[in-house]
């Protein structure tokens, strides 16, 4: 048996809103060497089902979610994530709070709390149909089972501007924060499946090419062995601590950071989950601020439009007593 974990982020570039890390963990009834081939076969089938209208749109979240598409831009993203929830035999969440608990998230306990509060009470689904999600989850089961693949869990972690800025003040940079959150989530998912061969697939973190130090820190590893550090992929083997660290037959864990990592299905599902959570959060954020300042145009939080939004809300933010670091992520 092998555990395969996919990790990706949403919201790394914006100045407003949370940085969200998504993770998906899968069980493969075979050796690690077969994982890439098995998941490639599953990806081909899922893509064919999607194009035929019979399966979820599991893929790169940046392509699945498009504000220019006809109809609701949220629908395919939401359908993909809620189908994944059902595929792991979890009940479908009916509120944002249910979904946050399922993914291991809680709202920030800082001055910005009111901006995000609606997220816990909003009804789900927002844009898709429950029956469609169930039908597509059944399709996923029928595709995974003959390949010896099963979705074990979904999880997210997030960091809001106040905590992000506080981390910068300790000497971390933006890339450090992303890597520590991502690998911290991967380590948590791995701990749920102890004594098991494991593969962790991550999308590359910006232009960063060397990860041995942060991998060693997040996994408390005695030694991290670099296998490759190229322009397209960085790959490592984790050698565990403890008296059995060098014993033969001990489970191995490999970690890879790849350009275009979303092409691997576990990473794609993680990417979509992170993106869905961020979009729900920004929806709650924009509704809060529209109530505070009628006529204010919503924002996705990316730098150019975030500056427009920041200028237009300056007076109201001052009235509410919100300091700049509570809402504006510095990097």
Where would I find each of the regions flagged by the language model?
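RNase H-like, Mg2+-dependent phosphodiesterase core
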Residues: 1-331
